[in-house]
Structure formats: C-alpha cells, structure tokens
Amino acid sequence: MATPDVSVHMEEVVVVTTPDTAVDGSGVEEVKTVLVTTNLAPHGGDLTEDNMETENAAAAACAFTASSQLKEAVLVKMAEEGENLEAEIVYPITCGDSRANLIWRKFVCPGINVKCVQYDEHVISPKEFVHLAGKSTLKDWKRAIRMNGIMLRKIMDSGELDFYQHDKVCSNTCRSTKIDLSGARVSLSSPTSTEYIPLTPAAADVNGSPATITIETCEDPGDWTTTIGDDTFAFWRGLKDAGLLDEVIQEFQQELEETMKGLQQRVQDPPLQLRDAVLLNNIVQNFGMLDLVKKVLASHKCQMDRSREQYARDLAALEQQCDEHRRRAKELKHKSQHLSNVLMTLTPVSLPSPMKRPRLARATSGPAAMASQVLTQSAQIALGPGMPMSQLTSVPLGKVVSTLPSTVLGKGSPQAAPASSPASPLLGGYTVLASSGSTFPSTVEIHPDTSSLTVLSTAAMQDGTTVLKVVSPLQLLTLPGLGPTLQNVAQASPAGSTIVTMPTAAATGPEEHTATIEVAAVAEDHEQK
C-alpha cells in the first residue's frame, strides 16, 4: 500500500519490558520500566495508540541512579528478539584519548576484572581498558577512567553510580562506595536531565520507524536524603505535637536493640550469614557508621603494630642471649680442653714394673755378709718325706727351709722349734728351723738325683763338718760344728741362696742312717721384719 511521504513528529511514552535475570541465580525476573521519548516518522495514515506496541506494562523501581553532573545521556540499545524487547544501558567513558562504553548490567562488584567495557566491538575489563589507553602506571583504575570528564571514583563515592545490584551481589573486597551524608545525592524532587541521542538503524526500530530514546532517571527511595517535602515535615511535627514522637522513638530503639541483639548472637557462630552481612551493610549506610568501623580497624591495627614491635624487641633480646650462651659454651669448652691437656702433661704415666728375673749373686766373705743375706728372708719352707731332691729347684729364693724327720711328719703338721732351742742354732740373726730333740748326725748320705746337686766330698761327710753345696739355684749344708764351716758358707753361698738344715734320726746301732731331703709342702708365713 502506497503511503504519502509525510513526516509527523510526535512524542509518546513507550514502556519497554526487559527481562532481567538476577546474578545470584535465583531465577527471578525483574521488570524494568524505561521511560522513553520517541520521535516517530510514519509514512502514512494517522498514528494511533494501536500502532504502538505496549506489552506487559508495569510500574517498577528505577534501574539506576543518574547524576545531575552527567551531561551525557545514557545510551539505551534496543534489540528485538522475537516478541521480546531487551534494553542495554551503557555509559560513555574515556581514558586518555580512548573512548568506550560501560555496560552497566555487566558492571558488577568489584568490577576491575569484570568484562563490562565495550571497546571497538570487544568486551573487555576496566583494567584492560586502562592498559590499552596507556594509563597502566596509574594504580587506581577508577581515577583513570572518566565519565563526562569526571573521575569514576568521584562519581561512585558520591553515590551517583554504583555497581549493578550491589546490594545483592558484593564481593566484600570493593572499596568503591563511601557513605555520603553531605547531601550530594540527587533527591527525588531534583530535576532530571534528559538528552535525545539517535540510535543506530540496526539497533533500534520501534514499529519500523527510527526513534530517539531518552531515559528519565529517578532516585532510589531507600537512599539517604537531606531534603523532604512539606507534607512529610508536617507529619512528623504533628506526631511531636500529639506527644507520640517519644513513643515512636522508643519503639524504634526497642526494635533496633532486638535486631542488634539477635545479630550479635548470630555472629558468634561462624560463618557469617548473608542476611547478617546485608543487615550490617544497611545499618552502616543508613546511619552513617562507616567512620566507626574505620575507627575500630585503625585502633586494632595500631594495637597489632605495637604488639608486633614488642615481639620483635623480645625476639632480638632472646637471640642476643642465645648468642651470649653459645659464646660462653665455646669458652668453657676451650678451657676444659686446655685443663685436660695440662693434667695430661703433669700426671706421670704409670708403667708396670718389669719382672726381674732371679739371678745368682756371688758370695761375699765374712759373717756380716752372710747375715745381711739371711736378713732378707721373709718366709719359711717345710721339707718332708715323699718328694725327690729334683723338686728343690722350684723352691723360690730367699726362703728358710727346714727338714723334719719322717716320724714327726707322719704324725701331723710340723712344729717349729723356738729360737732359744739349743738344737736350732742361730745363723746371721735368723733361726734355722729343725725338729725339736733332733741331733745332727755325723754322717749324712745324699742321693743326688738332679744335675743341680753336687756332692763335694763323700769322705768329708763322715765327720759332719763339711758343707755340701747345691750349685744352682739351691745350696745344701750341714750345721753340726759351726766353726770354720760358717766362714766357708759365707764365702761359697751366693746372694739370695737358701739355707737348709738336714737333721736325721738318732742312731741306735752301728748301722748307717741316711735321710733323703724331699719337699713335702711350701708354706709362706708373712711376718713383720
């Protein structure tokens, strides 16, 4: 159907419904009402309300807060997908000479690494946008990005712009907003700025006609405001005049106390619940208690710093004491080693005395020498029958040997005669032991059965005055007639020799009595000299 080329300008309010899914995955769709002003150019016929597609009209809260300082309007892109219309809210931003658009629906907390900036048909994060713009040296990306010539941080600190659904989705690591109690926020009664920005042909066509869309912003009713209407002021003044304001304040106080009491009980059990975090955030924002939170943090930080310094000083003192103890231990160890070395040098090494082999000494002349040799004797040896002469070689030197007759030895242990006995003459101050009552016979017969026994003269043995000598290691002699015999013994006996008496039984007839000297036992009698 042909239509005349007539352009008719008219402004209408179009309600556009945009399904929006919550970020937290609750699946609840929010309906946003966007007030737009359209500039329609139909090609014919009268335009009525039937030509405008208005579906799912609903009244809802505004999507965001707009600043009176934002001179540039917010661009809304309309995309038609089937029968549904979806609106995209973007903010033009700059960083240096680079320009981009901030997609508000994707601008979620904390925002620095969230891909929410459309730059040359690519969606990147604000951090990447700052790097591409050559402002990577700036530490704060919110100061590097500007919106209408104003730093993004200043806009967000004043509360004019916040993250998308920040009251529902917060990372607890953001430092983007500060509570503004100075009245910098735009009140509900403040005028809103609107500007007409034409959309691209591919992006927006309403009923087949190009449209210019603007958004009328409104302030969130929950924000802190410093200006109220006359009716509101009259309401509270009426409560005051009626005397009910005190009761209302008491109810407020009781409700707040119960809320804080329950909150205090719940925060004792970790972890912190989401509703408690939301409650704390609302209390801080609505009552301006952020400074109190900062005060608590600053006090705790100061206390921790003091404790850390004290611990550092204590640790340094302990390390110094440890070093001192180690040094003293080394000194004591060195002194101990030095003293040990000194003691080793002063203490003589005790070596075992070598065993002296017995040796024969030449006999010296004179009774004095004989007596000096006999004085060294310290024990006595008893001779008895039953042992040959060859065993006399095992008798140790320096012993006094006595012989007893077989009649005495057979009866029991031999008894030594006292030193005053006439049968026991003295030899060099020592007693020569013999049996009591025995006499020295005139004839003694010796049977030499070893090479160490030598009979000097058998004829001399008959008169009882000749000394019989055992060459080595023992000597044998007779004692009757102590005249020149002792002199000969002193000359012939070596040092350390043994003096032996050979008593025999008394003779009763003309037979010859013989005695054989044998070792019956060896007994040492330790006497004090």
Swiss-Prot record:
Q: SAND domain spans which residues?
A: 80-162
Mind listing the GO biological process terms from this record?
Answer: positive regulation of transcription by RNA polymerase II; regulation of transcription by RNA polymerase II
Pfam families reported for this sequence: SAND
State the GO CC annotations.
cytoplasm; nucleus
Residues annotated as binding DNA are 135, 139, 142, 153
Chain sites annotated for binding Zn(2+): 109, 166, 170, 174
Chief location bin: nucleus
Q: GO molecular function of the protein, one example?
A: DNA-binding transcription activator activity, RNA polymerase II-specific
Q: What is this protein called?
A: Glucocorticoid modulatory element-binding protein 2
Q: Which organism is it from?
A: Rattus norvegicus (Rat)
